[in-house]
Amino acid sequence: KKNGYAVDSSGKAPECLLSNYCNNECTKVHYADKGYCCLLSCYCFGLSDDKKVLEISDTRKKYCDYTIIN
């Protein structure tokens, strides 16, 4: 399993302001374990390995991974 910004068929990650929106989006639409709003896009945790995710910098990934843990 992996973490990241899950993308839809048009290659876009859902934009957000609220974390509960992302949790629903990540769990119900992308079947992840959970999700939250990180830097204005929905960041999902526990995505299946074959899910497409947005290419992001390591710095941004570390930031989003770190924020949910703490």
UniProtKB/Swiss-Prot annotation:
Gene3D superfamilies for the chain: Knottin, scorpion toxin-like
Keywords noted in UniProt: Disulfide bond, Ion channel impairing toxin, Neurotoxin, Secreted, Toxin, Voltage-gated sodium channel impairing toxin
Family: Belongs to the long (4 C-C) scorpion toxin superfamily. Sodium channel inhibitor family. Beta subfamily.
SMART domains in the cross-refs: Knot1
Protein name: Beta-toxin Isom1
Function: Excitatory insect beta-toxins induce a spastic paralysis. They bind voltage-independently at site-4 of sodium channels (Nav) and shift the voltage of activation toward more negative potentials thereby affecting sodium channel activation and promoting spontaneous and repetitive firing.
Superkingdom of origin: Eukaryota
Tissue: Expressed by the venom gland.
Major place of residence: secreted
Gene Ontology terms, MF aspect: sodium channel inhibitor activity; toxin activity
